[in-house]
Amino acid sequence: MIKLVNICYDYPDTCGLKDLSLTVNSGDFICLMGPNGSGKSTLLRLLSGLASPTSGAYQFHDQPITTTYLADAQNRQQLHQRIGMVFQNTDVQLFNTSVTEEVAFGPRQLGLSAAMVAQRVADCLQLTDCANLADRVPYQLSGGEKKRVALASVLALNPEILLLDEPLNGLTIAAQQQMLTLLQRLQAAGKTIIMASHNYQQVQAVGERFIIFNSTHQVDADLTRADLDQQPARQAQLMTL
């Protein structure tokens, strides 16, 4: 599905990612773990097409995702439809309009009929436990509600892959559990999920693969949950991120 080979990304004044190679398979639930600034968010931006690698190769379903490819607006739109992203700060992706209009925006851009848009909005609001929020606007929502509405708007495009940047950050324990349960349902429905987190305790029960970054912006390990169960020292290290 996704193949990254020797990916590097440089910001003007620092390294963002260094020599990253990774394969993502359909149906994976991957947690990107590591300290703040280690490259987790940078990787999500690259996967979503919001940035291009400085060097290395990125393929999605055997299609090279290059700077030239992303320069084409239609290519970018197609990639964003198939790989959806929920940002850590959801305020950057929510409009100052009702939740219904927020979720309807994407399907309308796809040219769906009014009836199909209405049905998709209803389905996505129901799936994300947001049906009771349909007439609200962002300033009336809690942090957890904003995250779920942002996820509903992404799901309205029916992506294959969901990217989530620290989706549990700032949420109450109840809202965290609600989000994790929702993500498990989405994986069971066939979605591939890649989420960034610095809190292993929050995600250890749902993640199936754990990509662990170190402070030098490199991948230190790619481990399954079973692998980690056999490495208590590694688990203890992750608990201190």
From Swiss-Prot:
It comes from Lactiplantibacillus plantarum (strain ATCC BAA-793 / NCIMB 8826 / WCFS1) (Lactobacillus plantarum). CDD domains: ABC_cobalt_CbiO_domain1 (cd03225). Residues 2-240 form the ABC transporter domain. It is a peripheral membrane protein. Disruption phenotype: Deletion of both larO and larQ leads to a loss of lactate racemase activity. Addition of Ni(2+) (but not Co(2+)) restores lactate racemase activity in this mutant. This is Nickel import ATP-binding protein LarO. It is found in: Cell membrane. Keywords: ATP-binding, Cell membrane, Ion transport, Membrane, Nickel, Nickel transport, Nucleotide-binding, Translocase, Transport. InterPro entries: AAA+_ATPase, ABC_transporter-like_ATP-bd, ABC_transporter-like_CS, ABC_transpr_CbiO/EcfA_su, ECF_ABC_transporter_ATP-bd, P-loop_NTPase. Induction: Induced by L-lactate but not by a racemic mixture of DL-lactate. Makes part of the larR(MN)QO operon. Belongs to the ABC transporter superfamily. Its EC number is 7.2.2.-. It holds the Pfam family ABC_tran.
